[in-house]
Structure formats: structure tokens, C-alpha cells
From Swiss-Prot:
UniProt record similarity statement: Belongs to the heme-copper respiratory oxidase family.
Protein name: Cytochrome c oxidase subunit 1
UniProt remark on cofactor binding: Binds 2 heme A groups non-covalently per subunit. Binds a copper B center.
Positions bound to heme a3: 376
GO terms assigned for molecular function: cytochrome-c oxidase activity; heme binding; metal ion binding
Binding positions (Mg(2+)): 368-369
Top-level taxon of the source organism: Eukaryota
Segments traversing the membrane: 17-37, 63-83, 102-122, 145-165, 183-203, 234-254, 268-288, 305-325, 338-358, 380-400, 414-434, 456-476
UniProt KW keywords: Calcium, Copper, Electron transport, Heme, Iron, Magnesium, Membrane, Metal-binding, Mitochondrion, Mitochondrion inner membrane, Respiratory chain, Translocase, Transmembrane, Transmembrane helix, Transport
């Protein structure tokens, strides 16, 4: 009975739980890989004694964190759990397709780990650029397995996106018009469109790479009239929207958390927040070549991509200042989720500022492929997306489980993590400005100090992760009853009559839900 409940589930809460548990496991795998990277770089000289293995670990770390940690947790976990509850729907529009979306992910994960484990592994970086990923530089099955892994993960995301879009358009409760949709629902709605439009391009690119490797096509081989730069354009046309896919649901969750602990019914400038997310989604498709400033583009092309990239800072700024306006003058409840949200706003903004620096093509030519870029995207991912996940998890944990996390130890975990990630990634700005390149397993002695500091920071983050596992155990062991949060009157997900809401949210489909604004 239990086996069929979890294997053949058509229930959005069960599938959301599966996604959250899977994402937690994948997150531990990805964290372990990052600790291997930082152990190698903790001091000059070699630990692994093999640059290929080092690059395999770097590649797997990136792909695991993106496709098997952030996306399953944010979109699959929080999306499945919260969106039907927030819009007053009995479940998702296509419950069985929802189940398939989840069960495509573990085989995809196994294929990725297999790609790292067979032959000499895929040491291409997560971008899989040819000719390094061609059958000459990477003979054997590793890259092919990675390609199949991405195909499965992509198929899963496309199915999930269709499901979310259909659910949000068709299954809102009466009175829940689009201009009253909770911001998290809006964020997943926009994210689903980004996935739907960008993933097929990635699928095309990696399929062409597969045929280049195995049946002698020359899409990316100049010898047959192909061009490796074509792959970069296709990949980044997916890859740039992808980074917004990773952060947009986080924006939605942070909006809920900040409004909630400010004692507000909604964030400041609700409609502006919605338009800002849509604008970020649209602009995200128009800036992909800023990842390619060093491949030799015309100066006018570079001018366009520099300008377009900087324009994205405008809607992002609207969001940041609206969050700050929500906090302004309110009686804050200093609980753990708010700490994560404030940490998010501060550190995401810092990461955004280094992004503005990198948008300048003339500067980027110097900083491209240095640790400055690594520092930039880890500030927006490791302290943006991950902090948003922790904010959302600590906020909605009572809703999901009916129990409360330990309030004091939850705060302790936040401060431990805050120190760890900042100590890890802030020094990398210095390394990048000093010219230390990415994806190398060793470095000149001059870079020793900040690498050592960075590796100490990663050890602190590792301890924080172990402490978080203990926190979850402690919550289930102590069984402190969850109570309706004080300011939950504006959020539909807290209005159901039990924590967690019953397996089937409604005994009968509700006819009306009155929403007072």
C-alpha cells in the first residue's frame, strides 16, 4: 500500500514531498562535490593528482546543483505543494503527468552520476562546449550519458511546466483573478514559460552534439562546415533563461516571507512586482551572448548585449526596493524565515552588482573565466536561490509537516551558513581580480591566502548543512505542534482546517472562496 502510494502517486502533496526529499539528497551529493573542489584548492599542489577527475567533479557539481537540487526543490517541491493550495485548486491539472515528471528525475540523476563514473568522466564544465566535448577530446560514453541525462531532466521540466501553466490558467478558485494571484504562483507561472521556451533549444543543441560525436555529423566541426560557436549560441540561449528559472521562484517565495513577517497582507507594489517578473522573463531571452564576449563579436553586437544586460537590473531593482519598502516601518517578527529573506535581499543584491560589472563587455573580456565570475554566480545562486529555499522551507515547514522547527537553533543554522558562504565566496572576487582562472585544479603560490580562506568557509557551510539535517530530525522527534501563523489571513494556503491540509484538500470542489482585499 505504502509502495503504491509513493510510486504511483497522483497527489500534489505527495509528489511535492518526493521532490523535496529527492532535492535534499541531491543537494547533499552536490555539496559533497563542492567540498572536494575546495579541498583540492585549499592549498597549492595536487590532492586528486588528476585534472580530468577535478573537472569531472566541477561539472557534476554544477549539473547536480542546478538540475537536481534547485529546480526539483523550488519548482517541483514548493511548486507542487503550494500552488494548488494557494489558488484553491483540488490538485494539479494533470496528476499522472505530474507523477511522471518526478519519476523522470531519478533516472536522469543516475545517468549523470554514471557519466562521471564510467571511462574518464565528462570533464567539460556544465556548458559541455565542443570541441572539448567532441569524440576526439572526450572519447568514450561519458558525455553521451550526460547528454541523455539532460534530455530526461529537460523532458521532466517541460511536462511539469505544461502542468503548472494549465493549472494556474484553468484551476483558480472563483474570485482569484490574475491580478490577485499570490506572487509565488506568478513566479512559477513565468518560470514555466521560460522552461517551455528555452529547454527545446538545449535539447536541439545536445542532440546535434550527440550526432557529431556518434554518427559523424559536423554541426560543430569546422572541418565539415560547422561552427563550435553555434553550440555556444544555442547553449546560452537556454543557459541564460535557466539562471532566471533558478532564481524567479525564489523571488516569489521571498515576497511571501517578507510580507508575512512584516505583518502585511501583501508586498509593497504587488502589480509592479508581477510586471517586474514578466519583464525579467522576457529580457532573459535577449541577453544570452553576454556569456560569449570573448569569442570575437562585433563591437556593436557587444554594445547591444552590454546595454540589454544592464536593463535587466531595472526590474530586478524594482523587486529589491519593493521588498525594502515592505519591510520599511513595519513591526518585524524576527523569526528564522525572515533572517533568510533579509540575507537573501542583501547578498542577492551584492551578486547583482558584480553582475553589472561583468555586463560591461570590455571589463568582462578581462574577467571572463576567472574566479570573479564564480564569485558572482555563487552570490546569486548559493546565497540567492539557496537562501530562498531555506526561507521558504523554514516558513512553510509547519504547513507541510504540522510541526515547528526549533526557533533558536534555526537562527543558529542561519548565522553559521551566512558566515560559511560569505567566507567561501567573498575572497573569490579578489582571486578573480588578481587573474586566477576557473576550472584549474592548481594555482601559483601567490593565490594561496584567499583560497585557504575560501576553503575554510566551505567547511563551515558543510557543518551548517549537517546541523540542518539535525534540525529536521529534532523537529520530527520533538513534535512541537504547528500553529496558524499570526499574519496568515491574506494567504490561502494557511486557511485549510489542518496542518498539513488533508490528503485530498477538499471533500467536494469548493463553489466560492471570498477574497477580501
Amino acid at each position: 500500500m505504502q509502495l503504491s502510494r509513493w510510486l504511483f502517486s497522483t497527489n500534489h502533496k505527495d509528489i511535492g514531498t518526493l521532490y523535496l526529499i529527492f532535492g535534499a539528497w541531491a543537494g547533499m551529493v552536490g555539496t559533497a562535490m563542492s567540498v572536494i573542489i575546495r579541498a583540492e584548492l585549499a592549498q597549492p599542489g595536487s590532492l586528486l593528482n588528476d585534472d580530468q577527475i577535478y573537472n569531472v567533479v566541477v561539472t557534476a557539481h554544477a549539473l547536480v546543483m542546478i538540475f537536481f537540487m534547485v529546480m526539483p526543490i523550488m519548482i517541483g517541491g514548493f511548486g507542487n505543494w503550494l500552488i494548488p493550495l494557494m489558488i484553491g485548486a483540488p490538485d494539479m491539472a494533470f496528476p499522472r503527468m505530474n507523477n511522471m515528471s518526478f519519476w523522470l528525475i531519478p533516472p536522469s540523476f543516475i545517468l549523470l552520476l554514471a557519466s562521471a563514473g564510467v571511462e574518464s568522466g565528462a570533464g567539460t564544465g556544465w556548458t559541455i562546449y565542443p570541441p572539448l566535448s567532441s569524440n576526439i577530446a572526450h572519447a568514450g560514453g561519458s558525455v553521451d550519458l550526460a547528454i541523455f541525462s539532460l534530455h530526461l531532466a529537460g523532458a521532466s521540466s517541460i511536462l511539469a511546466s505544461i502542468n503548472f501553466i494549465t493549472t494556474i490558467i484553468n484551476m483558480r478558485t472563483p474570485g482569484m483573478s490574475f491580478d490577485r494571484l499570490p506572487l509565488f504562483v506568478w513566479s512559477v507561472f513565468v518560470t514555466a514559460f521560460l522552461l517551455l521556451l528555452s529547454l527545446p533549444v538545449l535539447a536541439g543543441a545536445i542532440t546535434m552534439l550527440l550526432t557529431d560525436r556518434n554518427i559523424n555529423t559536423t554541426f560543430f566541426d569546422p572541418a565539415g562546415g560547422g561552427d563550435p560557436i553555434l553550440f555556444q549560441h544555442l547553449f546560452w540561449f537556454f543557459g541564460h533563461p535557466e539562471v532566471y528559472i533558478l532564481i524567479l521562484p525564489g523571488f516569489g517565495m521571498i515576497s511571501h516571507v517578507i510580507a508575512h513577517y512584516s505583518g502585511k497582507r501583501e508586498p509593497f507594489g504587488y502589480l509592479g512586482m508581477v510586471y517586474a517578473m514578466i519583464a525579467i522573463g522576457v529580457l532573459g531571452f535577449l541577453v544570452w551572448a553576454h556569456h560569449m564576449f570573448t569569442v570575437g563579436m562585433d563591437v556593436d553586437t557587444r554594445a547591444y548585449f552590454t546595454a540589454a544586460t544592464m536593463i535587466i537590473a531595472v526590474p530586478t531593482g524594482i523587486k529589491v526596493f519593493s521588498w525594502m519598502a515592505t519591510l520599511q516601518g513595519s513591526n518585524l517578527q524576527w523569526e528564522t524565515p525572515l533572517l533568510w529573506a533579509l540575507g537573501f535581499v542583501f547578498l542577492f543584491t551584492l551578486g547583482g552588482l558584480t553582475g553589472i560589472v561583468l555586463a560591461n563587455s570590455s571589463i568582462d573580456v578581462v574577467l571572463h573565466d576567472t574566479y570573479y565570475v564564480v564569485a558572482h554566480f555563487h552570490y546569486v545562486l548559493s546565497m540567492g536561490a539557496v537562501f530562498a529555499i531555506f526561507a521558504g522551507f523554514t516558513h512553510w515547514f509547519p504547513l507541510f509537516c504540522g510541526y515547528n522547527l526549533h526557533p533558536l537553533w534555526g537562527k543558529a543554522h542561519f548565522f553559521m551558513m551566512f558566515v560559511g558562504v560569505n567566507l567561501t565566496f567573498f575572497p573569490q572576487h579578489f582571486l578573480g581580480l588578481a587573474g586566477m582562472p576557473r576550472r584549474y585544479s592548481d594555482y601559483p603560490d601567490a593565490y594561496t591566502l584567499w583560497n585557504t580562506v575560501s576553503s575554510i568557509g566551505s567547511t563551515i557551510s558543510l557543518v551548517a548543512m549537517l546541523f540542518f539535517i539535525f534540525l529536521i530530525w529534532e523537529a520530527f522527534a520533538s513534535q512541537r505542534e504547528g500553529v496558524t501563523p499570526e499574519f496568515a489571513n491574506a494567504s490561502l494556503e494557511w486557511q485549510y482546517n489542518s496542518f498539513p491540509p488533508s490528503h485530498h484538500t477538499f471533500d467536494e470542489t469548493p463553489s466560492t472562496v471570498v477574497i477580501v482585499k
